[in-house]
Regions:
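A generic structural signal for tightly packed, nonpolar segments enriched in small/aliphatic residues
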Residues: 1-147
Length: 147
């Protein structure tokens, strides 16, 4: 309803991010322009993020015979974090009304791996919870506030 300039979500939806990129790199999925912006700002504040694709063919995994959308498909394990991102994208919305309305720019940061450091301290992170993405979100907020 508010039609924001962009939507950025930070979540731990599946363990797939940890499997794919380990505990130090956050996969970022969404609209290419916003994903690039998030990753660039993350690098500037010392957080490691990596763009991941959203292959269109994975969206069909969420098709359901009894609901508008399913959040998972029993037995389907390939591309778990990508399927989860497709699920989130389904709720993003558009900037206007009608079929030609532009989508709201959106990025999903899957912090399942990087939210907790089980290894040796690195950078500004000790062992344990890392607070990953906080500095990036602050940098993004500052970036959006500039004219």
């Amino acid at each position: 309803e508010e039609k924001p300039d962009a939507i950025v979500d930070v979540a731990t939806l599946t363990g797939s991010a940890r499997v794919a990129l380990g505990e130090r790199i956050v996969p970022v999925m969404g609209d290419d322009g916003l994903v690039r912006r998030v990753i660039e700002l993350a690098g500037g504040v010392g957080e490691s993020m990596w763009a991941m694709p959203l292959p269109p063919e994975l969206r069909s995994v969420l098709d359901s015979e009894v609901a508008d959308i399913a959040n998972a498909k029993p037995g389907h394990t390939a591309g778990g974090m990508l399927v989860a991102a497709h699920f989130l994208r389904a709720f993003v919305g558009t900037r206007g009304e009608g079929t030609d309305a532009a989508p709201i720019p959106w990025a999903h940061l899957d912090i399942a791996g990087a939210a907790n450091n089980s290894g040796a301290p690195f950078g500004t992170n000790g062992k344990g919870p890392t607070g990953i993405a906080v500095r990036t979100l602050l940098a993004l907020t500052e970036d959006f506030s500039r004219p």
